[in-house]
C-alpha cells in the first residue's frame, strides 16, 4: 500500500527542506517532523485490540496496537527517517536494506540485506525518502517478501524530483496489501 500525503504543514516543511540555504540540523529536524506525519497517515489502519487499564479513579477500556511491525530503512537516506518512526512505534523490530543506483540504467543494485524474519501477521514497512522511478521500492518489497512478509508498505515522502515517482511501483506492489 502506498500513502501519499497532501497536507499544507508537510508542504511548508518540504519547502524549507529543499532550500539549499537550510542548515543540516534544521534539515534533519524537518525530515523527522515530516516522517512523523507520514507515519500517522500510513499507520491509520494498523490493527488494534481492546484492553482494560486501571486509571487513578477506575478501570476503563482503551485500545493498544496489536500488530507487530518491522521497520526496514533503505541505506543511507532511509536512516534519517528511522528515529521518527521509532518514536511512533518504539516496539518495532528493525532491519536494513542497502541499495545503490546504477547510473547508466537508473536501476537499483542491492548490496546489503539484513532483515529479521517476518512472521505472517507482522507488518513490514520499507522506509526511503528517495523515490524517483520506484525501482528501489519494487526491490525493497521483493526483499521483504524474501523475509516472508505477508503485509508490506512503503513509506516515503512525496515530492522528490518531480519526475513520475510512481512509474513502476503501483503495478508491482504486494498483492495482499
PLM segments and residue spans:
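PRPP-associated nucleotide enzymes
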Residues: 1-177
Amino acid at each position: 500500500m502506498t500513502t501519499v500525503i497532501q497536507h499544507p504543514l508537510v508542504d511548508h516543511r518540504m519547502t524549507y527542506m529543499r532550500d539549499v540555504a537550510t542548515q543540516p540540523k534544521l534539515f534533519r529536524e524537518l525530515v523527522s517532523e515530516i516522517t512523523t506525519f507520514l507515519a500517522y497517515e500510513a499507520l491509520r489502519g494498523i490493527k488494534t485490540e481492546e484492553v482494560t487499564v486501571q486509571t487513578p479513579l477506575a478501570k476503563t477500556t482503551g485500545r493498544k496496537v496489536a500488530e507487530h511491525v518491522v521497520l526496514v530503512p533503505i541505506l543511507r537516506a532511509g536512516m534519517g527517517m528511522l528515529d521518527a518512526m521509532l518514536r511512533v512505534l518504539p516496539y518495532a523490530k528493525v532491519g536494513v536494506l542497502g541499495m545503490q543506483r546504477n547510473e547508466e540504467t537508473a536501476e537499483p543494485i542491492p548490496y546489503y540485506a539484513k532483515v529479521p524474519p517476518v512472521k505472517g501477521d507482522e507488518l513490514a514497512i520499507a522506509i526511503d525518502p528517495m523515490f524517483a522511478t520506484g525501482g528501489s521500492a519494487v526491490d525493497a518489497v521483493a526483499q521483504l517478501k524474501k523475509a516472508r512478509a505477508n503485509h508490506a508498505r512503503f513509506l516515503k515522502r512525496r515530492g522528490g524530483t518531480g519526475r513520475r515517482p510512481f512509474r513502476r511501483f503501483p503495478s508491482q506492489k504486494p498483492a495482499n496489501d
